[in-house]
Amino acid sequence: MTIAVIIPTFNRIELTQNCLASINLHDHIDQLIIVDNGSTDGSNKLATIALPTNQGFATACNIGAAHATTDRLIFLNNDTIVHPNWTSFTDLLEQPDIGIVGPKLIYPDCQIQSAGIAVDFTRPPGLEAWNLNTNWATTPTDVDAITGACLAITSNLFQQLGGFDTGYWNGYEDVDLSLASIQAGFRNLYDPTATVTHLESQSGPERWTSVTENVTRLRTKWSHK
């Protein structure tokens, strides 16, 4: 099985350089696709695909996926540092009932940042999806959603689900895709045996500009299903 790593970028070239350096140290990947969202700091020079303007996370990832020629896709934030054997979690995709998988995400101080995402629409708006941030699982475990900071899916299923919903702006696209995977009859797994350090939102404040709209879209689309 072949793997493409798709990295959307928007400025903060130093983050991308550090991410790429870690990828080069660990594990073989078959295709690296960097999609730049109209950066002004030279990040476009590192890009496989340089977009003229910032079209957001979902669009950049979908464009990257369209250029992939591999069996598996890993969507990876540029504010991450990968660890040895980090791509091993994608082997779970060989199971026919598995839709989306993700590794353990940790902060630079090694505290857990995400062990998968839980979704509960009975909680107040804005709290319906939250990171499970404790070492609660020691083997691959079912979760509602996987964070888009590092998320793997087969190319076929990504295409079947229609990719990331571009109606979101830099937030909740990952939860949406994960719920679509479950609706299609698949399971989503968190794999604590693979690790990625996530600096979390170091690439800029734009993630927080459309939280209300993103939450409304997620609830409207999924809370009654």
What residues fall within each predicted segment?
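A short, conserved alpha-helix in the catalytic core of glycosyltransferases
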Residues: T90, D142-G162, G167-T195
